[in-house]
Amino acid sequence: MAVIFENPQYVHVLRMLNSMPARDKTFRALQFVAKLLSWHLFYGGSSLSTVNKWKKLESNISFSRKLFSIGKVLDYICKVYFDSLKLQNPLSGNKSALPTISFTKDVAFAGYATAELIGWFNKTELMPCSHSKQISTIGKQCLAVALLSSCLAGCYELQQNSKKIKSATQEASEKDSTSLQTLQKERKEILFFALQNALDATIPLAELDILKVNDGFVAAAGITTSLMSVYKTWIGSY
């Protein structure tokens, strides 16, 4: 047993799973795996009872994850406040669009988290809401806006990064060579999160029937982005 419990990789897994983001994204991955299996089994001709087992698992995991929205609402409200302090005066000479994009993103995320929390209270019947379906739709719209804002921010950061790389490439000093390596590493991070946000954005867009894709694609996108998040948490927990 000591071989298992004292194994560095085992200890690393436990340390990672002790963090809330890692647990949430792991549950999210399982949620979309259940969604993918229910979709595959349905179109594969499996019995309705078998399909419903996986749909029920997906629904239960989704329901339990909504409770995490309590902390997320407070977190995003705090971010919105600090983002508002960074908003630039339109008459100022600063042309950076990031503060405005960040403010829009966090307002939208706050709206989505609030809608999720209301949905949780409604389903538990602690605070029934007669407009739960409309609020759920608004929540999906907020999520789509937030993720598309994140994509826009990624495009803006990529543009700025490209300018810096071009400038650093034109210099031949050792200092600029180190700076270039840092910028190239930063570029990989920007592209990673841009891809993640773009894939995540397809989920609410599909649920709102704006993007015409099947549940299999949505589930695959959800699994991919969840594993991407788990990977980042894994790297960060070393």
Curated annotation (Swiss-Prot):
Its main location: mitochondrion. It is a peripheral membrane protein. InterPro entries: PEX11. One of its GO terms (cellular component) is peroxisomal membrane. The keyword Protein transport does not apply. Pfam families: PEX11. The keyword Transcription regulation does not apply. Keywords: Membrane, Mitochondrion, Peroxisome, Peroxisome biogenesis. It is found in: Mitochondrion; Peroxisome membrane. One of its GO terms (biological process) is peroxisome fission. Belongs to the peroxin-11 family. Involved in peroxisomal proliferation. Promotes peroxisome division and biogenesis. This is Peroxisomal biogenesis factor 11. It comes from Schizosaccharomyces pombe (strain 972 / ATCC 24843) (Fission yeast). The gene is pex11.
